[in-house]
Amino acid sequence: MNIQDDHVVVASMLSLEPRRPGEPLVLCGVDLAIESLVIDQAPLSPEEYSFADGRLTIPNVPGQPFVLETRCRLDPYSNSSLEGLYASGGLLSTQCEAEGFRRISLHPDRPDVLSRWQVRIEASRSSCPVLLSNGNAVQEESVGADRHAVTWDDPFPKPSYLFALVAGDLREIRDHYTTASGRQVTLRLHVEEGDEPFTAHAMASLKRSMQWDESVYNLEYDLDEYNIVAVRHFNMGAMENKSLNIFNSKLVLADAETATDAELERIESVIAHEYFHNWSGNRITCRDWFQLSLKEGLTVFRDQCFTADLHSEAVKRIEDVAMLRNTQFREDAGPTAHPVKPAEYQAIDNFYTTTIYEKGAELIRMLRTLLGPERFMNCLLYTSPSPRDNTT
């Protein structure tokens, strides 16, 4: 990804294997200017593909594994959709859930398509000294007088909605966590200048979350680095991108002298929620967006249990039920009522609701009651040796 002052050029190399040889290849793409398409080093002419209505269609592709190289230009500085890659507050950042990655590159933008990713980001060192993406940083290099590049490698297959990029001028707070097996993980909080003194509670909350997931679910963090970016201009509350969580500052920053207990607990809970997604959502993700609550309802249940274990189980349960009655019950009784597993939708972004999250968490809690804690835990600890089977 080559970041310039007025545009970004994204060159991708996809290794593809046809499941049904003879069928056309269809990829998603929105607001992209295609500069070139190449299959197995052979450039395609405009007559060999069509690009319309958010779909790239290549009718004739090899029947065996092949490599597709695409080169597209996009303008994140004029992107007002708040999806894909966009500029806000002097930073470039991404929001790819649910269908935002198609605004970055041509891709099979579905949650059941899992891929290994390696990303190289190049930008101006003066305007973008920090370049972040998923996984571990494996190479840093100087490119010309005022340009640099960082290459990130994520060894675990993930869908495109978990891709993340942040580029800009941020301050770093660094710490470390030693997992139960003895691996050392580097923890980094990236904040805007002047926010450094207000990060201690968030860092401590992250460490507590990691330790709780190990002790309760026997789930260790699986990479060498974990990054959280907290910026005021992020349009969502928080996003669980693999190893690069992006937060609105209000859910990370806290002054211990002035923050209320409720604010501190909220920060701790949301940081835990996004961290718990590392397994319940990222490593094991949903087959399609109709299954959204299988990651969100489950992870809400997990963060509820985390807060209950660290503080008061009774108080936490009362708070959760009060919230359910005041918000989700009203949704269920109104014109926007919908099931936890919807049968259809016009736009998936409309389904990030209290029904999917909080009512979904209650269904997970009910399953634990019906199965009993031991059988429930055995079911939840399922992981498949095949990444393709991890979309369930």
Q: What residue ranges belong to the model's regions?
A:
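Hydrophobic alpha-helical and helix-loop surface patches within well-folded domains
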Residues: 152, 181-384, 388
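Acidic/His-enriched low-complexity segments
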Residues: 1-225, 250, 255, 343, ...
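Ala/Thr-enriched low-complexity intrinsically disordered regions
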Residues: 391-392
